[in-house]
């Protein structure tokens, strides 16, 4: 398994231990069902932790969208302009009461909750929004497992322009009944107030799919173009980034190949130099002119006409030649003569130099 995936899984498990409410989101429903099917038990979510997680998620979404708008400002792909008319500042009120989902509910409590619900709807129709909130909260505390109560209270929070509170209620309603259209509708409207265009479009589209609503459809038509613009911008940005990464990868491969080929050429040059000059210190600069005693015809300059020359192995097999080649004084004199044969007269009285020249002349002369 990919080590990165294992690391991500380990981090996810750690997060779940710290905040079990992560497992109670709709996205994690499949994981809860699997854990329970294996005989495990998913710990109950704390509403405080859940609310904090929702707030963090909203901040992450907003940060992601802001990053898309601000990253690489010099690039054409960062030029994203969105009409944010109607977007408001996020509410920061303390999380609302959600009731005890593990409480034992009696029929009397359910009846009383229905009465509170009816009174809340009447208050809502009369424009008494805060009173409606209070009555819906009373109903929720009496029957905390009824999804419609959270959805109704969320609708009032939207009217009060408290989108984060509305989102918390909708999240809870969806956990209880993910097939109800109302929570998606009001959560979509709350996201629209926050400028979360993609989230708003997803929720409103799902609400219309579950139970078509003209009001939700009208808002979907408003937010969808902006959501599509953001999605297209993201795809364009990711495509540019992928192209840039591919280009950089190609450049790295090209550079590595060039360095490898350069190293091969240098190695080949060293190998050829070694085979040409063997162990001769300093080589034979300027070639070996044909003015050695005994004659070395055709060997001026770059040493043409070498078909009759003895091999270096044969020359170096002579111990006296090899010893002379290791003598710095002899090699300096030899190179001096090789570059300018007329300088040989300077070494007429040097037996070591003349001995080497005589031996080489004899060897080359014998193979001419």
UniProtKB/Swiss-Prot annotation:
Transmembrane segments: none annotated. PROSITE patterns: TPR, TPR_REGION. GO terms for molecular function: dATP binding; Hsp70 protein binding; identical protein binding; protein dimerization activity; protein domain specific binding; protein-containing complex binding; protein-folding chaperone binding; unfolded protein binding. Residues 280-299 have a biased composition (Gly residues). GO terms for biological process: chaperone cofactor-dependent protein refolding; negative regulation of protein refolding; response to bacterium. GO terms for cellular component: cytoplasm; protein-containing complex. Belongs to the FAM10 family. Homotetramer. Interacts with HSC70 as well as DNAJ homologs and HSP90. Interacts (via the C-terminus 302- 318 AA) with GRK5. One HIP oligomer binds the ATPase domains of at least two HSC70 molecules dependent on activation of the HSC70 ATPase by HSP40. Stabilizes the ADP state of HSC70 that has a high affinity for substrate protein. Through its own chaperone activity, it may contribute to the interaction of HSC70 with various target proteins. This is Hsc70-interacting protein. It comes from Rattus norvegicus (Rat).
């Amino acid at each position: 398994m990919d080590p990165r995936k294992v690391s991500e899984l380990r981090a996810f498990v750690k997060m779940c231990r710290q905040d079990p409410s992560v497992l109670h989101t709709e996205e994690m429903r499949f994981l809860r069902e699997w854990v329970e099917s294996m005989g495990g038990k998913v710990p109950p979510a704390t509403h405080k932790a859940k609310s904090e997680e929702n707030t963090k998620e909203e901040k992450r979404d907003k940060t992601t969208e802001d990053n898309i708008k601000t990253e690489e400002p010099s690039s054409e792909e960062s030029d994203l302009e969105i009409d944010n008319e109607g977007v408001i500042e996020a509410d920061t009120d303390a999380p609302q009461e959600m009731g005890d989902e593990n409480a034992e509910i009696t029929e009397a409590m359910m009846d009383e909750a229905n009465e509170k619900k009816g009174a809340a709807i009447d208050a809502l129709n009369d424009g008494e929004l805060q009173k409606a909130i209070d009555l819906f909260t009373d109903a929720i505390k009496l029957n905390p497992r009824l999804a419609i109560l959270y959805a109704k209270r969320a609708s009032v929070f939207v009217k009060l322009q408290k989108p984060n509170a509305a989102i918390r209620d909708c999240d809870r309603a969806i956990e209880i009944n993910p097939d109800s259209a109302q929570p998606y509708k009001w959560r979509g409207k709350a996201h629209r107030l926050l400028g979360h265009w993609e989230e708003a479009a997803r929720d409103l589209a799902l609400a219309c799919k579950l139970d078509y609503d003209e009001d939700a459809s009208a808002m979907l038509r408003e937010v969808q173009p902006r959501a599509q613009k953001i999605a297209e911008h993201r795809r364009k940005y990711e495509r540019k980034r992928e192209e840039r990464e591919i280009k950089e990868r190609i450049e790295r491969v090209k550079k590595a190949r060039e360095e490898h080929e350069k190293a091969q050429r240098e190695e080949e040059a060293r190998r050829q130099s070694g085979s040409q000059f063997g162990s001769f210190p300093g080589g034979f600069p300027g070639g070996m002119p044909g003015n050695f005693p005994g004659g070395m015809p055709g060997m001026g300059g770059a040493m043409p006409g070498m078909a009759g020359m003895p091999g270096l192995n044969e020359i170096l097999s002579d111990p006296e030649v090899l010893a002379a080649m290791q003598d710095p004084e002899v090699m300096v004199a030899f190179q001096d003569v090789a570059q300018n044969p007329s300088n040989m007269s300077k070494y007429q009285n040097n037996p070591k130099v003349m001995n080497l020249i005589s031996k080489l002349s004899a060897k080359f002369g014998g193979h001419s």
